[in-house]
């Protein structure tokens, strides 16, 4: 055990996991949590790792990327996964928990660790320290957010998600789309889904009648200037989208030699070209409605949505500019960020990022080199996405197999292919774990 201390700010899923991982390696931890003295608009208790939305940690099977991420966490002795497994409730093919028992489990184990000192107070500025992990989540307090903005620069801290859906490339019907940029300028960077007048009118009718996701009370005053939901634009008139995200100007369908009546553009989301973003289609529709309505677009009839559109309050940094894949900041290697504030999306992803940051902060204080997790693992792919994505278009993301390196072996059956990816990932995690001892 060293006499050095990791300071962790925020005891949500990421902060609790980070503190646990550092303490497991013999490092003292000061864990700051402002609740219950000061509650966020979403939290209701002072328990650590409180689940404020769903009680589901999503799919359990290894052929699902989040199922693999959870299994990797188990191999790495995750506190969050240990508590989730002992407080689970029946949920079919998913892992769901009794949220009160889960939060109590995490809190009690943290409180029972002699190396972790709990400080129930608000942190209003980035602390000085030998190693500091900021894990304050999407509802970071105003005072601390202001100081983070000072550190990152005002253009590198965002306060809401306005995200368009992302689809898996292999699910796009390439026979119905064409690759082109407007007016043929530059490289043909976009996939274009052309719509006839009749197809557009069917799509528009479905869009304006689709059911919107309810806003939480603390999100009702959000305004998304310059980033209007596509359904709000559509409601302004039948032709509004034709002058906005579905404008066809400068595009010629090579199969007809004519300009389509309307076009939906898909922009490549990652270097491997496995993911495509629906340009300008940020939306607040319910997820089932997004699937139903957007599959009316030619070429997207069988689209697999790896990320649905969302519009909600979410404080996060521009990680591709600010972070190394070790979760250290580029400006200060003793300062780490973890959790949703880094641009990972979801309970499990937040905890996994805390696990990586906690391990690396402990290594830093032990005089060891912080480590980048293997690229072919769910942990490594998540870290790679948030630090290597295009900074100009960076948006929070759930783990999905589109973030992994392209799989070289040709396996037609998708489930079998993903099971093979998972097997290799777990083998890599087990080898990697030996370097952490």
UniProtKB/Swiss-Prot annotation:
GO cellular component: cytosol
Keyword terms: Cytoplasm, FAD, Flavoprotein, Methyltransferase, NAD, NADP, Transferase, tRNA processing
Cofactor entry: FAD
Location(s) in or outside the cell: Cytoplasm
Gene3D superfamilies tied to this protein: FAD/NAD(P)-binding domain
Keyword Repeat applies: no
Xref: Pfam families: GIDA
Enzyme Commission number(s) of this protein: 2.1.1.74
Catalytic activity: uridine(54) in tRNA + (6R)-5,10-methylene-5,6,7,8-tetrahydrofolate + NADH + H(+) = 5-methyluridine(54) in tRNA + (6S)-5,6,7,8-tetrahydrofolate + NAD(+); uridine(54) in tRNA + (6R)-5,10-methylene-5,6,7,8-tetrahydrofolate + NADPH + H(+) = 5-methyluridine(54) in tRNA + (6S)-5,6,7,8-tetrahydrofolate + NADP(+)
Positions with a binding annotation for FAD: 10-15
Enzyme class: transferase
GO MF entry, a single one: flavin adenine dinucleotide binding
GO biological process: tRNA methylation; tRNA wobble uridine modification
Keyword Repeat on entry: no
SUPFAM superfamilies attached to this UniProt entry: FAD/NAD(P)-binding domain
NCBIfam families per UniProt: gid_trmFO, PRK05335.1
Protein role: Catalyzes the folate-dependent formation of 5-methyl-uridine at position 54 (M-5-U54) in all tRNAs.
The family this protein is said to belong to: Belongs to the MnmG family. TrmFO subfamily.
Name of the molecule in the record: Methylenetetrahydrofolate--tRNA-(uracil-5-)-methyltransferase TrmFO
Species whose genome carries this gene: Pelotomaculum thermopropionicum (strain DSM 13744 / JCM 10971 / SI)
Lineage of source species: Bacteria, Bacillati, Bacillota, Clostridia, Eubacteriales
């Amino acid at each position: 055990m060293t006499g050095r201390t990791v300071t962790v700010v925020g005891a949500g899923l990421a902060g609790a996991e980070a503190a646990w991982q550092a303490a497991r390696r013999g490092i003292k931890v000061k864990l700051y949590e402002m609740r219950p003295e000061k509650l966020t608009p979403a939290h209701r208790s002072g328990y650590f790792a409180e689940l404020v939305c769903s009680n589901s940690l999503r799919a359990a099977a290894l052929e699902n990327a989040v199922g693999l991420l959870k299994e990797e966490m188990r191999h790495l002795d995750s506190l969050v996964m240990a508590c989730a497994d002992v407080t689970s409730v029946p949920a079919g093919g998913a892992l769901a928990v009794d949220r009160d028992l889960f939060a109590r489990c995490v809190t009690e184990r943290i409180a029972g660790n002699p190396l972790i000192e709990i400080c129930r107070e608000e942190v209003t500025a980035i602390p000085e320290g030998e190693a500091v992990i900021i894990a304050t989540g999407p509802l970071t307090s105003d005072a601390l957010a202001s100081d983070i903005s000072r550190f990152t620069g005002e253009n590198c801290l965002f306060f809401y998600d306005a995200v368009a859906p992302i689809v898996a490339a292999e699910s796009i019907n390439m026979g119905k789309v064409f690759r082109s940029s407007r007016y043929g300028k530059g490289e043909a960077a976009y996939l274009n889904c052309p719509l006839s007048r009749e197809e557009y009118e069917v799509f528009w009718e479905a869009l304006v009648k689709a059911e919107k996701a309810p806003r939480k009370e603390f999100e009702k005053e959000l305004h998304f200037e310059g980033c209007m939901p596509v359904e709000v634009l559509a409601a302004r008139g039948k032709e509004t989208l034709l002058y906005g995200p579905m404008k066809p100007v400068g595009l010629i369908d090579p199969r007809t030699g004519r300009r389509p009546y309307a076009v939906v553009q898909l922009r490549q989301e990652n270097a491997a070209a496995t993911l495509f973003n629906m340009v300008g289609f940020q939306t607040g529709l319910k997820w089932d409605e997004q699937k139903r309505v957007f599959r009316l677009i030619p070429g997207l009839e069988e689209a697999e949505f790896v990320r649905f559109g969302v519009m909600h309050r979410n404080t996060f940094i521009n990680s591709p500019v600010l972070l190394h894949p070790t979760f250290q900041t580029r400006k200060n290697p003793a300062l780490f960020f973890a959790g949703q504030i880094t641009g990972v999306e979801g309970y499990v992803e937040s905890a996994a990022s805390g696990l990586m940051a906690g391990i690396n902060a402990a290594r830093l204080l032990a005089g060891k080199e912080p480590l980048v997790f293997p690229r072919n693992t769910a942990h490594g792919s998540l870290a790679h996405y948030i630090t290597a994505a295009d900074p100009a278009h960076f948006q929070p993301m759930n783990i999905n197999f589109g973030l992994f390196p392209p799989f070289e072996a040709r396996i037609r059956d998708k489930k079998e292919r993903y099971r093979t990816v998972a097997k290799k990932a777990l083998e890599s995690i087990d080898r990697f774990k030996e370097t952490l001892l």
